[in-house]
């Protein structure tokens, strides 16, 4: 039987429209179908209705297929965007504080078709030990893995036996456990959507299963059993910060970023995991993967069409080399199509193995920023030949610090001028308010107020609208006294190194520790040591049962240097690292 394209599309459209579009499922997409549209699809867009069209497939010059998506009218800023030309600039912003820090977080969907970023904040994750938690999760292929990580990461971290004594090991263990949970049948997805009750049989609970491939739309009742599918091409990065006393511990998987400001100088506490980074590329190629980039057509300012190189991607699909989930390519969680069970987690094309760095809060520590790649990474802007979108380079870590400083200082100057106008010039220049004239002094006075952080964080996110990506940031400001240590925890002396290792390793891996610039990473009994990324000016050592290499690189893909392990660690140091007498 032959079904004509117009008839086929009409049947699909009728099927989709027949489903009610007003049932409440918490603001998420209600369904998707296929329809054929003649002419300009924007003519079929109702900005005030429940439906919008998403380009899907063009068969010829007449029949163009679009996915017809049901969405709630009163959707939040985290809902689906209608078009790349209709940015969602509304933001979800929060703030809070305890006796050591104050924070503001902001997230904006921007020009993306959907919001796939998520974040989590726990100011008092462990009140007895003065522990605060902040995390940014940048999803790809969908938002569900990022949402699950935001819901579970800090909870699982608190459950770790090593949480009180070894944060580095605890973070690494949580990444492995999260990846394992994503393979569990339906459990993790069910926790995201508790309204999907297996006992419900009402017809109003029928909904569509949205497939990210866009190939079809399945209709099922929530009371029916649905076979579980691994999030093959869905995953999330994770950049988590744990502040305990005067110590900052950062765990990073993927291309989100954490940057610390000291006296106005940016200090990277994470490294972007990109496929073209030499160490990442080496791991990918070793297990049979490929890394390449493609050219995209674009219009320049003169209206001429030109080609621009896109980002390096694994298998031409994934632009981050570490994340959660996956089996062929891996990211912090998900991407099971990129993972191979033959290899250990450290050696996957896309691995969930985190980099851990530790820094101390000192008197000149001002604030830190955790941001998704919508703020800090290079973005490809031109996808529409009918409209000119200039290519936007990334904000460097120093750019981010300078931006925050500028906004906070302008607020101080306004407050100072206001005091002067009120005849209180003397108060403006007291010891606590000299910040009005010196941008390098930590902005810790209560004069600034939470509104300043709130506004600054929102402006930082809004500044990255041109990246055509979701933008999420957490701005954490340190209060006076934040540099004071808490009583030493059991088995950890002040100034001692923590040991970071994999969750499945009975003997801890060599420390993956950085006191701002020095890192030591490696494994025991591992034939191929996987080294963390190397930052400019840092010294890293990879240790194993046999020999280790140190690789240094630059963004241009520079040469490698070797370091003899004996020159870095003597017998006494090795005994200390392995816990031997």
Swiss-Prot record:
- The record's disulfide annotation reads none
Q: Which BP terms does GO give this entry?
A: signal transduction
- Keyword Metal-binding applies: yes
Query: Which residues make up the binding site for Mn(2+) 1?
Result: 138-139
- Provide the E.C. number(s) assigned to this enzyme: 3.1.3.16
Q: How is the cofactor bound?
A: Binds 2 magnesium or manganese ions per subunit.
User: What InterPro entries does the record tag this protein with?
Assistant: PP2C, PP2C_BS, PPM-type-like_dom_sf, PPM-type_phosphatase-like_dom
Molecular function terms from GO: metal ion binding; protein serine/threonine phosphatase activity
What keywords tag this UniProt record?
A: Hydrolase, Magnesium, Manganese, Metal-binding, Protein phosphatase, Signal
Signal peptide stretch: 1-21
Q: Where is the PPM-type phosphatase domain?
A: 102-478
What family is it from? Belongs to the PP2C family.
According to UniProt, the name of this protein is: Putative protein phosphatase 2C 22
Q: Which organism is it from?
A: Oryza sativa subsp. japonica (Rice)
């Amino acid at each position: 039987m032959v079904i004509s394209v117009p008839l086929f599309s009409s049947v699909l459209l009728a099927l989709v429209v027949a489903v009610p579009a007003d049932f409440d499922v918490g603001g998420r997409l209600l369904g998707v179908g296929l329809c054929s549209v003649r002419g300009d699809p924007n003519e079929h867009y109702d900005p005030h209705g429940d439906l919008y069209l998403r380009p899907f497939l063009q068969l010829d010059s007449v029949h163009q297929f679009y996915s017809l998506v049901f969405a709630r009218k009163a959707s939040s800023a985290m809902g689906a965007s209608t078009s790349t030309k209709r940015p969602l600039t509304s933001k979800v912003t929060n703030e809070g504080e305890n006796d050591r820090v104050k924070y503001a977080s902001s997230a904006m969907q921007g020009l993306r078709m959907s919001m796939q970023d998520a974040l989590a904040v726990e100011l008092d994750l462990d009140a007895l030990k003065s522990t605060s938690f902040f995390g940014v999760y940048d999803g790809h292929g969908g938002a569900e893995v990022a949402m699950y990580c935001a819901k579970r990461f800090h909870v699982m971290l608190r459950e770790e036996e090593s949480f009180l004594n070894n944060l580095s090991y605890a973070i690494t263990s949580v990444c492995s456990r999260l990846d394992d949970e994503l393979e569990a049948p339906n459990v993790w997805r069910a926790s995201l959507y508790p309204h999907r009750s297996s006992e419900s049989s009402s017809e109003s609970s029928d909904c569509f299963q949205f497939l990210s491939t866009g190939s079809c739309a399945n209709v099922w009742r929530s009371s029916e059993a649905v076979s579980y599918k691994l999030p093959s091409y869905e995953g999330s990065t994770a950049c988590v910060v744990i502040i305990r006393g005067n110590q900052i511990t950062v765990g990073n998987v993927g291309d989100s970023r954490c940057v610390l400001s000291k006296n106005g100088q940016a200090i990277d506490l994470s490294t972007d995991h990109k496929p073209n980074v030499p160490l990442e590329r080496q791991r990918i190629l070793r297990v049979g993967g490929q890394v390449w980039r493609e050219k995209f057509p674009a219009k320049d300012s003169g209206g001429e069409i030109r080609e621009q190189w896109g980002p390096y991607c694994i298998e031409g699909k994934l632009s981050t080399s570490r994340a959660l989930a996956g089996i062929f390519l891996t990211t912090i969680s998900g991407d099971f199509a990129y993972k191979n069970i033959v290899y250990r987690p450290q050696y996957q094309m896309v691995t969930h193995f985190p980099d851990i760095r530790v820094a101390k809060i000192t008197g000149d520590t001002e604030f830190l920023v955790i941001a998704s790649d919508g703020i800090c990474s290079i973005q490809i802007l031109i996808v529409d030949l009918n409209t000119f979108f200039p290519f936007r380079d990334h904000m460097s870590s120093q750019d981010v610090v300078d931006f925050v400083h500028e906004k906070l200082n302008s607020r101080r100057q306004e407050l100072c001028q206001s005091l002067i106008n009120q005849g209180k010039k003397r108060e403006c220049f007291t010891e606590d308010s000299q910040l009005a004239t010196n941008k390098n002094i930590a902005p810790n006075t209560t004069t600034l107020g939470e509104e300043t952080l709130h506004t600054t964080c929102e402006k930082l996110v809004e500044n990255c609208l041109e990246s055509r990506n979701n933008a999420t940031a957490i701005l954490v400001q340190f209060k006076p006294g934040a540099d004071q240590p808490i009583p030493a925890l059991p088995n950890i002396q002040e100034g001692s190194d923590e040991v970071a290792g994999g969750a499945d390793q009975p003997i801890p891996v060599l420390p993956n520790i950085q006191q701002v610039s020095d890192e030591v990473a490696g494994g025991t009994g591992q034939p191929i040591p996987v080294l963390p990324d190397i930052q400019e000016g840092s010294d890293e050592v990879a240790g194993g049962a046999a020999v280790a290499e140190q690789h240094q690189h630059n963004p241009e893909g520079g040469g490698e240097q070797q370091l003899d392990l004996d020159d870095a660690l003597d017998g006494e140091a090795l005994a200390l690292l392995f816990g031997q007498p």
